[in-house]
């Protein structure tokens, strides 16, 4: 299962930014090429593993959650909303301070309301900073977080998110960078 995803990740080049080993893949970066069958494999696995019947909205994070949310939305018919990097100043907009292993920035939530049953999807959980910020903001809005899904898990970020937010983070595959190459540690689906 998830053979295309695993193969794509294992072929990903690795670059080093400071002390952070960053792998470049179609799932996490949209380059070199994101093939439709890769996205379908991912959303098929999500649809099989999770009961999505009561989900009101899919919530993704700009930028690399957008293609995943789009594919999942088309497959399931569930609408999606993007947590953006740009402030729009719309009524009810919630600002999030995001601190990751490679920088700090603000994100903005629009279109998520109290009581919305949501699925949060993102490409990767690595340091956990983005998901911690997003989950805490969604809880502040009083959204009902049904699932948090990161396609790829790298490092200890998933455990950190779960510890700091009390919210389970589901992943499809766990990887590590060993000797400059991406290695599959396990897959959870």
From Swiss-Prot:
Annotated EC: 2.4.2.8
Gene3D superfamilies from the UniProt entry: 3.40.50.2020
InterPro entries: HGPRTase-like, PRibTrfase_dom, PRTase-like, Pur/Pyrimidine_PRTase
Enzyme class: transferase
Subunit annotation: Homodimer.
HAMAP family, sorted: Hypx_phosphoribosyltr (MF_01467)
Similarity comment text for this entry: Belongs to the purine/pyrimidine phosphoribosyltransferase family. Archaeal HPRT subfamily.
Protein name per its UniProtKB record: Hypoxanthine/guanine phosphoribosyltransferase
Source taxonomy: Archaea, Methanobacteriati, Methanobacteriota, Methanomada group, Methanobacteria
Gene designation: hpt
């Amino acid at each position: 299962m998830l053979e295309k995803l695993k193969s794509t990740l294992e072929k990903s080049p690795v670059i080093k930014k400071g002390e952070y080993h960053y792998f470049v893949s179609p799932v996490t970066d949209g380059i070199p090429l994101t093939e439709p069958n890769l996205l379908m494999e991912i959303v098929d696995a999500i649809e099989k593993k999770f009961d999505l019947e009561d989900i009101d909205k899919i919530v993704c994070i700009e930028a690399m959650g957008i293609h995943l949310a789009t594919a999942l939305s088309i497959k399931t018919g569930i609408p999606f909303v993007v947590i953006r990097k740009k402030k729009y100043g719309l009524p009810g907009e919630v600002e999030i301070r995001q601190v990751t292993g490679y920088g700090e920035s603000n994100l903005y939530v629009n279109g998520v309301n109290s009581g919305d049953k949501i699925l949060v999807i993102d490409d990767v959980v690595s340091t956990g900073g983005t998901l911690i910020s997003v989950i805490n903001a969604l809880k502040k809005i009083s959204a009902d977080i049904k699932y948090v899904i990161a396609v790829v898990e790298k490092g200890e970020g998933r455990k950190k998110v779960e510890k700091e937010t009390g919210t389970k983070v589901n992943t499809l595959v766990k990887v590590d960078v060993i000797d400059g190459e991406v290695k599959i540690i396990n897959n959870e689906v």
